[in-house]
Design a protein with these regions (language model features):
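C-terminal catalytic/acceptor-binding lobe
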Residues: 2-32, 38-43, 207-291
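N-proximal low-complexity "stem/linker" segments adjacent to membrane-targeting elements
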Residues: 2-85, 90
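Active-site acidic short loop of glycosyltransferases
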Residues: 43, 102-105, 129
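Residue-level detector of anion-binding/catalytic polar loops
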Residues: 77, 130, 262
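Residue-level recognition of beta-strand->loop/alpha-helix junctions
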Residues: 82-84, 135, 267
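Active-site nucleotide-sugar/metal-binding loop of Leloir-type enzymes
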Residues: 93-106
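Conserved catalytic core of nucleotide-sugar-dependent glycosyltransferases
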Residues: 96, 117-235
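Short beta-strand-to-loop acidic/aromatic patch adjacent to the donor-nucleotide binding site
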Residues: 104-115
Length: 291
């Protein structure tokens, strides 16, 4: 049989582009999801936390739907927690509070403007790191950087141009000595938009940073309520000595490193940071450049 779409009659799942060569392949494609694959991830439970200012992108929603299907297939328990907050710092702390009220083994931050691959999360789980993230490009295009590489003769294809336009919000212990193990490397700071955190990390921070507890009523999804398990682990950080300002993601990594912990990044899977791009131009330039 050739490649086609088949409907799994038990789960109403569309199996797209499944390569069917033999009768056994056909039966496997029809097999209900709960009978497929392995129990490798059964011991884990993921709490997906998303702080939202107003809405989320369709790309984020598509990624979550696909991830939920993959978790179901791998028998991995997953729950989703979207919290509305005008402050991303407060939103992340509220996600932590919700995570602590759950029985999940891992907190997975996925921001509402991120499109990720489920396989990246499963790889990070298997890496077994305390804090591990998938770094994503900033919402800016580095044209000067790309032009410099072009002058140096390092641009050989359109893909080279695309890759040269990006910069990533991440710091490493030693830029001259980067060690990569199965796509995983140690970092000092990385973004929180796609970050997996072990429960033990939060529990140790509660023990070591008791002064960061928050006890006050908070507006949650329009309701003014008491929220237990609130801790200020995500907050901006100003360094008066270095005269630098860091976001809540780098500040969180520093809290963990100050306790002797390490942070890591998984860098070999593609990820999308969804943002607006303004396509500015005038047709006159097209006429001039074509001469």
């Amino acid at each position: 049989m050739s490649k086609n779409n088949y409907i799994n009659e038990d789960t109403y799942q569309t199996l797209q582009e499944v390569s069917i060569e033999t009768q056994s392949d056909y039966e496997k494609a029809r097999e209900p999801l709960w009978k497929q694959n392995t129990n490798e991830f059964e011991k884990y439970q993921i709490f997906v936390g998303t702080p939202v200012h107003s809405d989320e992108s369709i790309h984020y929603t598509q990624a979550l739907i696909e991830f939920q299907k993959e978790c179901f297939q791998k028998k991995l328990k997953v729950s989703f927690h979207l919290i509305k907050s005008s402050l991303v710092t407060q939103g992340r702390n509220l996600c932590v509070a919700g995570f602590l009220e759950s029985k999940a083994t891992h907190l997975l931050f996925i921001d509402s403007d991120i499109y990720f691959q489920g396989k990246s999360i499963f790889t990070m789980l298997k890496a077994n790191k305390d804090i591990i993230s998938v770094p994503y490009p900033l919402k800016t295009l580095m044209w000067d950087k790309a032009f410099k590489k072009m002058q140096e003769g390092k641009i050989k294809s359109p893909d080279d141009i695309r890759r040269s336009l990006h910069t990533y919000p991440m710091k490493v212990p030693d830029a001259n000595n980067i060690k990569l193990n199965k796509g995983v490397m140690e970092v000092t700071d990385s973004p929180t938009g796609c970050m997996l955190i072990k429960r033990e990390v939060i529990e140790k921070m509660i023990e070591k940073y008791p002064d960061k507890q928050i006890v006050q009523k908070t507006v949650i999804n329009g309701q003014y309520v008491n929220k237990p398990n609130m801790w200020n682990f995500f907050d901006t950080l100003h360094d008066p000595k270095e005269k630098t300002y860091n976001g809540e993601d780098f500040a969180f990594c520093k809290l963990w490193r100050d306790l002797g912990g390490k942070c890591h990044a998984y860098i070999t899977d593609a990820i999308v940071h969804v943002g607006e791009h303004q396509y500015q131009g005038k047709f006159y330039d097209e006429l001039i450049s074509s001469k």
